[in-house]
Amino acid sequence: MARILIATDAWHPQINGVVRTLDMTARMLRRLGHTVEVVEPSLYPAVPVPFYPEIRISLPRPGRVYDRVRRFRPDSVHISTEGPIGLLVRRYCRLRGWRFSTSYHTRFPEYLWRLARFPEGLTYWFLRWFHGHSCPLMVATPSLENELKSRGFRAPLRRWSRGVDLSVFHPRTKPLDTYPRPVLLYVGRISHEKNIEDFLRLPTAGTKVVVGDGPARAELTRKYPKVVFLGYRQGQELGEVYSAADLFVFPSKTDTFGIVVIEALASGLPVAAYPATGPIDTITHEKLGALDDDLGRAVEQAQRTGDPAACAAEGQTYTWENCTQQFLRNLVPVSVRSTPHG
């Protein structure tokens, strides 16, 4: 069994796809008998991100991070994020001559441009540098792999998909008296970079339901009083919300995968989305939903052609066990000649 160190700037209590992916992967690795150390923000002092105060970024002293890595004596190192913790663990590996893997979870260039007008080109330059010595760089989808190649990323790319907890996300009998039908559902961060208003402004029948929180929630609650904002939901409570809906709408154009899409499928919900990275790799035929540059048309088509049984069957193919096996196959020993714990 291996000693695996995962470095991440995203961890609990944040609620997002990156944290869910890393948390489930660490759980599965431990279940398989591996020893896992997660170097994460709660271990160090942190400050809120200026334009996104609900997210805190850690500011660790380098020596504290280096000591933690050295004491753990990893067989493999995976660096999951490009923030201060990721940078320090990357630097430690480079100083030691260790090999390491990384992963590309978040479209920071697009987000930073949208939130702070920071030039995309500069952020992509930084990301090419950060991942330049990865062996390999893990990506979730074929379309993201092709995009990173086209943007000049030179590290070897390997696939690392995502999973669904099928004990939580599965079809249930729909309640009869929830909201006027059809119920159109969005689950995710309530922020402008998620393009959520493209969903909220659609002139659809029935009820729009939003699960999640974020910096734009107060503004959008006032602007769209007919929309039901439920706040955060987790676990079985979230699974029940999915299965009570009729259609899942995913308006984001900047996600790298969209775990919520496969959670919706596993719950028996067709998906309406833009033909963007993530949905374009997942919604592969009309029974699963519809993709269109006009989100309203995608909603109409998904309501016509979506098949809940086909959606549930497709969602069941995304398991965390399979994802974790992919992750394990992609890991590299810190040194070609290293012996365990040496």
Go through each PLM region and give its residues.
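Short alpha-helical donor nucleotide-sugar binding micro-motif in glycosyltransferases
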Residues: 131, 233, 240-245, 327
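Short hydrophobic beta-strand element within catalytic cores of glycosyltransferases
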Residues: 266, 270-273
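Donor nucleotide-sugar binding/catalytic pocket of nucleotide-sugar-dependent glycosyltransferases
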Residues: 124-172
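A charged, aromatic-enriched C-terminal amphipathic alpha-helix characteristic of glycosyltransferases
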Residues: 305-337, 341
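Conserved donor-binding/catalytic core segment of Leloir-type glycosyltransferases
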Residues: 176-209
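Aromatic "clamp/platform" in nucleotide-sugar-dependent glycosyltransferases that forms part
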Residues: 253
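Nucleotide-activated donor-binding/catalytic signature segment of Leloir-type glycosyltransferases, i.e.
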Residues: 218-236
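Nucleotide-sugar donor phosphate/pyrophosphate-binding loop at the beta->alpha transition
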Residues: 99-101, 110-129
